[in-house]
Amino acid sequence: MHAPNQISLAAKASGEPEFREVGLGPWAETHPGEPRPDDLASPNYDVRFDSALLDEGDRRNVLDRYRYWTVQAIKEDLDAHGRHDFEVAVENWTHDFNIGSMVRTANAFQAKRVHIVGPHKWNRKGALMTELYQHVEHHPSIAELVECWHNRIAGEIAAERARAGVAALKAHAIASAHNGAETGAGNGSEGIIGNSGATVSSHVSALNAVSAVAEATAEIAQVDARIKELEAARIIALDIIPGAVPMETYAFPKRCLLLFGAEGPGLSSKALELADDVVYISQFGSVRSINAGAAAAVAMHAWIAQHAATAA
């Protein structure tokens, strides 16, 4: 029998560690004397709060601003604030334990959607229930996923073009109506005269028309920019293969689908075939690759570093 390691003995004698408590206890303890937000008679009533969590406390892995909220309320709030434009797809052919970690990271970086490819049942252990706050879609194959994603992008482009058309028609109608009103005023059809000798109602009408046209023009510019982003959308696979591009020099498109494979085999041949680009994380040690879950986190954060604003 080996003698106890001296470091281990010293560690036991150190009195460490002391961990801080995460989350909040029951509402009555954390907010003594304050009305409960789930009480219909309370001026602080808020439908987003969960009665069970208020009773028992909230130790979930959520941001403090979501303490005591229902799962649905949190999900709706994330949607309302706007999720990021990247999506995550994970191949589930081997029931890899890393999938849960990838889903958790996708939640942390507020991915628009998570796609599980392959069997419907996946290893949720590492997700720590974060999938409840995500939009998760299932696909039987990579081919079906890619077709679905391209169709969604095409649909969004069509919707944006329709929006641009409506804005252009609105601007044209406002300008035409204003020009017609000015013509009438020039013929003496307007009434009220201001101190400057100009027609007051015509002046106000002109300002309103200019403002409305400017708003419509700005909307058209926003739509054009959005269409360019959608047209530049790409499917990006993460794997180390000949011809892959180092992530450190890769410019991630704002709208993209990130493909991740399983620990060991990596991505399937079909996934690599259908991807627009393949990127890899540069390795400087002796190993060929890092853990699949860690690699996915690095890739998602690379997108965040290039496109996302700093979190509040």
What is the predicted function of each stretch?
Residues M1-A312:
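Post-transcriptional modification and biogenesis factors for structured RNAs
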